[in-house]
UniProtKB/Swiss-Prot annotation:
GO terms for molecular function: tyrosine phenol-lyase activity. The gene is tpl. It catalyses: L-tyrosine + H2O = phenol + pyruvate + NH4(+). Homotetramer. It is an enzyme of class 4 (lyase). Its EC number is 4.1.99.2. This is Tyrosine phenol-lyase. Pfam families: Beta_elim_lyase (PF01212).
């Protein structure tokens, strides 16, 4: 007789999110005719859609995450004093504990920090090397008189490359630039982890350490875009053998230790709807930043944020570095990406941290890049299922500030960005099925013509019409 207790080992078939849902928001389901009218009125720009006309909103993970009960409880403890809010000191302590920087200046969001940083460090004629551009970062650098220079590894520009750290800096490219223009014309090296425009790709700890050593040789600062540094820490834990047994919080602190400061949009990793910061180790630079904050953002103890929002961010930072949280967050992105790969749909690989990036060049090869294939694909996905995604290609790349010509990036992508703790596995299934349906009918799609182009960051407000 078989002993009932003697059973063969069973493989775990699935995983579940490390949270449960307390509050829900109804979603509006629209008809195809309603979506056709909405996207036409929006000029085929998903940024110009009304949120009430969107079923699943994958435009961005910026400020769209769900806060926890712990964060909401903190909102009730908001100290709204104009000066010296206790919530600022809680936020400052949380940043110092988990990121390790000495001096903190709060800002209303990440681009507020980018603006202040650019003003205190960049002068006309400077060069800022970095591991791929980001839209707002590069614009602030250019408005201050600087020129961004891409020194990311070549694999980052290849959507099909399986390099595990496509966010790595090419040390030879960086060295060549320093030798060519001189260290005195490089105010800092701009490092992002993860790299948004490359597909949410991470930079390795070993590579950042090597960049740090090179920068020290020449006396150049490193400034981190820490917006998704927690996600980057997760990839280091998963892909660098020396860190496989270390906690995310430990990895994050070492990662930041190789840099001299950071800009931060707290609307991503820190799990809040608004807010950011500029962190610096150099006290003299901090003094300059603090003086400018009063002009552009508000007093140095609130920086454009309410006390309640600073408290929510302080608590969100604490939650963001929990291993269970980040494992599930990146796991949901991977779930969607793997489903699309299984169906043969072209996406950027390896799967990144915050989003799945559809490769519009391979998805819609019949549409030339100057007819905006990624923009067209994003519009079509909305028409198919009410899913809002974001173009990350020629429209986002903008124009050369000297010649006025379009930049033609190697990567022409549509970003399906997953907000943290918001959507279920069923939403991911529906999204995958909608993408598959568009892919099945891809041959009938034609390009777009831009009929309105704003001066700066055109992807936000540009308007298009069908060719």
């Amino acid at each position: 007789m078989t002993d009932a207790k003697q059973t063969s080992p069973r493989r775990r078939r699935s995983w579940a999110e490390p949270y449960k849902i307390k509050v829900v928001e109804p979603l509006k389901i629209t008809t195809r005719a309603e979506r056709e009218q909405a996207i036409a009125q929006a000029g085929y720009n998903t940024f110009l859609l009304r949120s009430e006309d969107v079923y699943i909103d994958l435009l961005t993970d910026s400020g769209t995450s769900a806060m926890s009960d712990y964060q909401w409880a903190g909102m009730m403890l908001g100290d709204e004093a104009y000066a010296g809010s206790k919530n600022f000191y809680n936020l400052e302590a949380s940043i110092q504990k988990y990121y390790g920087y000495r001096h903190i200046v709060p800002t209303h969001q990440g681009r507020g920090a980018e603006n202040i940083l650019s003003q205190i460090l960049i002068k006309p004629g400077d060069y800022i090397p970095g591991n791929m551009y980001f839209t707002t970062t590069r614009l602030h650098q250019e408005l201050a008189g600087g020129t961004f220079v891409d020194v990311i590894i070549d694999e980052a520009h290849d959507a099909q490359s399986l390099h595990p750290f496509k966010g790595n800096v090419d040390l030879q490219k960086l060295t060549d630039l320093i030798e060519r223009v001189g260290a005195e014309r490089i105010p800092y090296i701009s490092v992002a982890g993860t790299v948004n425009m490359a597909g949410g790709q991470p930079i390795s700890m070993a590579n950042l350490r090597a960049v740090h050593q090179l920068a020290q040789t020449y006396g150049i600062r490193i400034i981190l875009d820490a917006t998704r540094a927690v996600e980057n820490a997760h990839f280091i834990q998963q892909r660098e053998e020396d860190y496989s047994s270390q906690a995310i919080a430990t990895i994050l602190r070492e990662f930041c230790s190789y840099t001299d400061g950071c800009t931060m949009s707290g609307k991503k990793d820190a799990l809040v709807n608004i807010g950011g910061w500029l962190a610096l180790n150099d006290y003299n630079l901090y003094e300059e930043a603090r003086n400018l904050i009063v002009i552009y953002e508000g007093l140095h103890t609130y920086g454009g944020m309410a006390g309640r929002d600073m408290e929510a961010m302080a608590r969100g930072i604490e939650e963001s570095v929990q291993d269970d949280h980040i494992r599930a967050r990146v796991g949901q992105v991977e779930y969607l990406g793997q489903k699309l790969l299984d169906w043969g749909i072209p996406i950027v690989v390896p799967i990144g941290g915050h989003a799945i990036y559809l490769d519009a060049k391979r998805f819609l090869p019949q549409i030339p890049q100057d007819q905006f294939p990624a923009q067209r694909l994003a519009a079509e996905l909305y028409l198919e299922a009410g899913i809002r995604a974001m173009e990350r290609g020629i429209v986002s790349a903008g124009r050369n500030k000297e010649t006025g010509d379009n930049y033609y990036p190697e990567l022409e992508l549509v970003r399906l960005t997953i907000p943290r703790r918001v959507y279920t596995q069923a939403h991911m299934d529906l999204t995958a099925e909608a993408v598959e349906e568009v892919y099945h009918n891809r041959d009938r799609l034609r390009g777009l013509k831009m009929i309105y182009e704003p001066k700066y960051l055109r992807f936000f407000q540009a308007r298009f019409e069908l060719q």
